[in-house]
Regions:
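A compositional/biophysical signature of low hydrophobicity enriched in polar/charged and small residues
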Residues: 1-106
């Protein structure tokens, strides 16, 4: 199953909700949501810095990942950015592809 990294930034409303509910409750909500899409949360970490939460999850495909990001962001508590993750074996497969390319100006 494809793996994704969701980078999450809390909005002021999202931060208020976090302060009210706590991190464990939000982790449980995320787990149920991902499982409802046929996936599984691998990790969920709160962080300092540009992003507030990092979630790695397996999902059935890009449309599931897109649906998750759209619905969660539309609710207004967070803004998400989704990164498709590749395993070492997927990179091995990618480098075996023949790609016809010419750099600009070459």
């Amino acid at each position: 199953m494809p793996k994704y990294l969701f980078k999450v930034k809390l909005t002021p409303d999202g931060l208020k909700g976090l302060l009210k509910e706590g991190g464990s409750a939000r982790r449980d909500v995320v787990g149920r949501m991902v499982e409802g899409l046929g996936g599984r949360v691998e990790t969920m970490y709160w962080a300092f810095g540009e992003d507030d939460v990092y979630v790695t999850a397996e999902l059935p495909g890009n449309t599931s990942a897109a649906a998750l990001g759209m619905v969660v962001s539309a609710a207004g508590g967070v803004r998400t950015s989704t990164v498709v993750l590749l395993s070492a074996e997927e990179v091995d497969e990618a480098v075996r592809h023949q790609v016809d390319y010419r750099a600009p100006g070459a």
